[in-house]
């Protein structure tokens, strides 16, 4: 593992964007595993800037997102589908058919988890996975104590996570979804990734 130190958030965002852009340039049809939350916003802004300058081409890129709230329509402003479109997808030339997120409106958890694991397998895994680490060490909606061999699964959000996320829902804890779909670390899915960028 290589540790890259950053002076501040802006520096970290640029360094993470450098890693992603190098992957896209080196393998134009790469599969990027993407994350949401406050941490990658600056990284996505840098990628959009480079795209606008003609330095990046996302036309062959496929993306697989880490997680999505269960029960939240994708058009909801706080769905991760909306987040990704607002911060990246709507600003670059990615093919909408190459964008993959868990379907938060599918209330059949077993079927949705199987479907998303199959999506990941169908693209031969992830070339580069962008991850953020939460305040308590969670990655995606995987808590630190969760089993390491899970594929995509449905989780009940901890009260701590619900409290932390209420800032996105007008400070109202009752509006925060109580469950989510999240990728796990099972080798047949995400651990195919050859590189990870954890910020």
Question: What residues fall within each predicted segment?
Answer:
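Glycine-rich N-terminal segment of FAD-binding domains in flavoprotein oxidoreductases
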Residues: 26-52
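Class I SAM-dependent methyltransferase SAM-binding "motif I" and its flanking Rossmann-like core
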Residues: 136, 140-185
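Single conserved hydrophobic/aromatic residue that forms the stacking wall/gate
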Residues: 191, 195-199
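Ligand-binding beta-strand-loop-alpha-helix segment within the catalytic cores
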Residues: 56-129
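N-terminal glycine-/serine-/threonine-rich phosphate-binding loop
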Residues: 1-32, 110
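A glycine- and small-aliphatic-rich helix-loop capping segment at beta-alpha/alpha-beta transitions
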Residues: 46-57, 80-82, 144-154
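A glycine-rich beta-strand to alpha-helix segment
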Residues: 30, 38-43, 118-144
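Short beta-strand segments
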Residues: 33-37, 65, 102-103, 130-133, ...
């Amino acid at each position: 593992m290589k540790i890259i130190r950053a002076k501040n958030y802006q520096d970290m965002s640029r360094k993470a964007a450098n890693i992603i852009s190098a992957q896209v340039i080196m393998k134009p049809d790469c599969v990027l595993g993407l994350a949401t939350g406050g941490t990658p916003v600056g990284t996505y802004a840098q990628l959009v800037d480079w795209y606008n300058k003609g330095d990046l081409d996302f036309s062959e890129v496929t993306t697989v997102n880490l997680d999505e709230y269960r029960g939240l329509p994708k058009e909801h402003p706080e769905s991760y589908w909306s987040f990704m479109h607002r911060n990246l997808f709507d600003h670059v030339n990615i093919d909408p058919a190459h964008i993959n997120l868990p379907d938060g409106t599918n209330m059949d958890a077993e079927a949705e988890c199987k479907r998303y694991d199959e999506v990941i397998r169908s693209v031969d895994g992830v070339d580069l996975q962008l991850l953020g680490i939460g305040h308590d060490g969670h990655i995606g909606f995987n808590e630190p104590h969760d089993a390491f061999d899970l594929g995509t699964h449905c989780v009940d959000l901890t009260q701590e996570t619900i409290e932390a996320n209420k800032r996105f829902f007008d400070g109202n804890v009752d509006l925060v979804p109580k469950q989510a779909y999240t990728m796990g670390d099972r080798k047949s899915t995400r651990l195919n990734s050859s590189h990870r960028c954890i910020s």
